[in-house]
Amino acid sequence: MSQSNPVRIFVTHAWQNSDDYLRVFEYLESQRNFFYRNYGTPDRRPQGDREALRENLRQQITPAEAIIALSSLYQAHQDLLTFQLRYAQASHKPVILLKPFGAPQEVPKALLDLADEVVEWDERALVDAIRRQARHEETTRWDTIEFKLD
């Protein structure tokens, strides 16, 4: 993965920039040497009926290599989120589910069943999940801890 070959992602949305939606990009931007292209366009809601909205979502999801699902959308936009994840699954796109931010809420089983991987809100965990699911890259890391023996 490089600037010339960024990972293509789609982050689930309900046609608005929620705090969680924006937080995903803060996390991705904080990681060095991680390049991505977002195919989601929550700020451009198409005109038309329910099918027009779904077709627009299909067009956003199709070029993506990985889907990042915000479980926080489920309660208010269950049908829309479920549609996005089912379409991703039918298109053989890996789904990375982010648990609810900051609250010890249970993730609904319906979402867990549609996810390939579930991660906490952690920059490293999110980027590693994207690398594993989208590009099948090895993401094993070792932290070096230095200490002095007295």
Residue locations for each model-derived region?
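Conserved beta-strand scaffold positions in the cores of enzyme catalytic domains, especially
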Residues: 36, 95-97, 118-120
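A charged, well-structured terminal subsegment
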Residues: 126-145
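Conserved beta-strand-loop-alpha-helix hinge of the TIR/SEFIR fold
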Residues: 60-103
